[in-house]
């Protein structure tokens, strides 16, 4: 998992 508040770009395709 790599998606949390402050790092939404982490879960972008």
Curated annotation (Swiss-Prot):
Coiled coil stretches, renumbered: none
Keyword Lyase set for record: no
Record keyword Secreted present: yes
Superkingdom of this protein's organism: Eukaryota
One Gene Ontology cellular component: extracellular region
Entry's Gene Ontology molecular function annotations: toxin activity
Residues spanning the membrane: none
Maturation and modification: Contains 2 disulfide bonds that can be either 'C1-C3, C2-C4' or 'C1-C4, C2-C3', since these disulfide connectivities have been observed for conotoxins with cysteine framework V (for examples, see AC P0DQQ7 and AC P81755).
Tissue specificity statement from the Swiss-Prot or TrEMBL entry: Expressed by the venom duct.
Position of the signal peptide: none
Keyword field: Disulfide bond, Neurotoxin, Secreted, Toxin
Entry's localization field: Secreted
Family: Belongs to the conotoxin T superfamily.
Its biological purpose: May act as a neurotoxin.
Comment block on domains: The cysteine framework is V (CC-CC).
Protein name: Conotoxin Fi5a
The organism of origin for this protein: Conus figulinus
